Structure formats: structure tokens, C-alpha cells
């Protein structure tokens, strides 16, 4: 029984092949993370700001601050 000879690894272009594969995976992962961030964080934050400013009354807030004595120039 003769020992089996392992085939030689293909070394030519090894770095280019690995970089191509890893770049494709990195690109897909970055798109996934960007989409996840947009839908989980950015859209919720945008909606929260819109809800806040929809009901925000500037004059009411100003009067509360004036009554609390925050402004020195407005009595």
C-alpha cells in the first residue's frame, strides 16, 4: 500500500482570490448594517423629532422659562 500524495495547494493568485471573496462579504455585510441602522435607529429618531415638533408650542415653553426666571432681560 503506497501512501497517498496530497495535491499541492494552488498558491498563484491566492491573495487576489481571498481578497475578492472577503471584499464581497464585507460589502454585503456593510449594506446590511447600513440598512439595519436606517430602519432601527434613523427612522425612529426622525419620527420622534417629527412627533415632538408637531406638538411643540414655542410661546408656551418661553412663558414657562420666563416665569421660572431663567431670562434676566425679560421680566
UniProtKB/Swiss-Prot annotation:
Membrane topology term: Single-pass membrane protein
Pathway(s) annotated for this protein in UniProt: Energy metabolism; oxidative phosphorylation
Mitochondrial matrix topological segments: 1-13
Gene Ontology CC, one term: mitochondrial inner membrane
Keywords: Membrane, Mitochondrion, Mitochondrion inner membrane, Transmembrane, Transmembrane helix
Ranges annotated as spanning the membrane: 14-54
SUPFAM superfamilies: Mitochondrial cytochrome c oxidase subunit VIc
UniProt keyword Membrane, yes or no: yes
Domain of life: Eukaryota
Gene Ontology terms: biological process: oxidative phosphorylation
Subcellular location: Mitochondrion inner membrane
All ranges on the Mitochondrial intermembrane side of the membrane: 55-75
Subunit-structure text: Component of the cytochrome c oxidase (complex IV, CIV), a multisubunit enzyme composed of 14 subunits. The complex is composed of a catalytic core of 3 subunits MT-CO1, MT-CO2 and MT-CO3, encoded in the mitochondrial DNA, and 11 supernumerary subunits COX4I, COX5A, COX5B, COX6A, COX6B, COX6C, COX7A, COX7B, COX7C, COX8 and NDUFA4, which are encoded in the nuclear genome.
Entry similarity comment: Belongs to the cytochrome c oxidase subunit 6c family.
Role according to the record: Component of the cytochrome c oxidase, the last enzyme in the mitochondrial electron transport chain which drives oxidative phosphorylation. The respiratory chain contains 3 multisubunit complexes succinate dehydrogenase (complex II, CII), ubiquinol-cytochrome c oxidoreductase (cytochrome b-c1 complex, complex III, CIII) and cytochrome c oxidase (complex IV, CIV), that cooperate to transfer electrons derived from NADH and succinate to molecular oxygen, creating an electrochemical gradient over the inner membrane that drives transmembrane transport and the ATP synthase.
Annotated protein name in UniProt: Cytochrome c oxidase subunit 6C
Organism in which the protein naturally occurs: Pongo pygmaeus
Amino acid at each position: 500500500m503506497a501512501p497517498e500524495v496530497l495535491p499541492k495547494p494552488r498558491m498563484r493568485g491566492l491573495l487576489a482570490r481571498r481578497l475578492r471573496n472577503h471584499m464581497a462579504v464585507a460589502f454585503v455585510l456593510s449594506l446590511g448594517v447600513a440598512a439595519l441602522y436606517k430602519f432601527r435607529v434613523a427612522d425612529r429618531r426622525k419620527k420622534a423629532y417629527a412627533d415632538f415638533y408637531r406638538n411643540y408650542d414655542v410661546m408656551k415653553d418661553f412663558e414657562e422659562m420666563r416665569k421660572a426666571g431663567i431670562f434676566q432681560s425679560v421680566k
